[in-house]
Regions:
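NAD-dependent ADP-ribosyltransferases
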Residues: 1-264
């Protein structure tokens, strides 16, 4: 609950595979899913124990952008890679920072995903509709923050930072910017309400829900458990007669039609 206590989303290094032929690169970022609660069931609890819903106007104010989902082998990614290599070979590194700004918003449409709870061999990231904000990389050096970390340096940073990828920079918010909080269990709801009071929260309209409640009440996770009516032999016979009547109304020799289609 540090985010609520500090009223700040802190940037953290997040590893991204921007090119299929190089190691991962970790950029400092803050990420959100642009999904309504009705489409949130697949992602509840996937990246952490609780979720915070913020207003779209707050996101626009701080400058979030949709992630650019690309295929590793697309012409776009290949062109960016060629430009980056050219700039890295120049005497003054030219537009290297600007190109890395673009790379920081690129994410594969599908790739492997491993979280603390579960792993996927082929996860479709584009379904998350991720919004992301990355600080201006060129300005980070003056704040003693590395603009990006390659794989080994990223692991070393986490070891030196108590296994955390967070940095000191962040984006603050007002209580009025928070729409809801989703906690893990029903017992956590009262605890979070008390915490908000101790944090001097003055927004009484913040909804606090627990994960199973959201899945069952808002999304309808129980719909698959509804018993479907069983058809009797009489019902089946009646349906078969209707099909026969429809075929007679539109007499088409289906077998010949299929054969002709295959021959063509």
């Amino acid at each position: 609950m540090a985010i609520l206590k500090e009223r700040t989303f802190r940037y953290s290094y997040s590893k991204e595979m921007v090119f299929n032929s190089v190691d991962t690169i970790a950029f400092p970022m803050i990420s959100f899913c642009d999904l309504p609660l009705s489409e949130f069931s697949e992602y509840i609890g996937k990246y952490g124990g609780y979720s915070i819903g913020v207003s779209r106007s707050w996101g626009i104010k701080i400058g979030v952008n949709p992630v650019w989902y690309c295929d590793f082998y697309s012409n776009v990614v290949h062109s960016i890679m060629k430009l980056l290599l050219r700039e890295l070979n120049s005497s003054d590194y030219g537009y290297v920072y600007e190109l890395f700004e673009i790379l920081a918003y690129i994410k594969p449409m599908e790739d492997k995903l491993k979280t603390k709870r579960v792993g996927y061999s082929k996860y479709r990231f584009s379904d998350e509709r991720e919004l992301r904000i990355v600080p201006y990389l060129r300005d980070l050096e003056s704040k003693s923050v590395k603009p990006f970390l390659y794989n080994k340096l990223y692991e070393e940073y986490k070891v030196s930072n108590n296994n955390s990828s967070l940095i000191e920079l962040g984006e603050s918010f007002e209580w009025s910017d928070i729409k809801y909080v989703i906690v893990k269990n029903k017992t956590d709801v009262k605890r979070v309400r008390k915490l908000l009071k101790t944090f001097n929260c003055d927004n009484e309209d913040i909804g606090i829900f627990y994960q199973q409640q959201v899945k069952a009440d808002f999304i309808g996770i129980e719909h698959n458990k509804v018993d479907m009516p069983t058809l009797s032999s009489t019902d089946l016979s009646h349906i078969q007669n209707l099909i026969t009547q429809l075929q007679n109304i539109n007499p088409i020799n289906w077998q010949n039609n299929i054969i002709n289609h295959e021959n063509n």
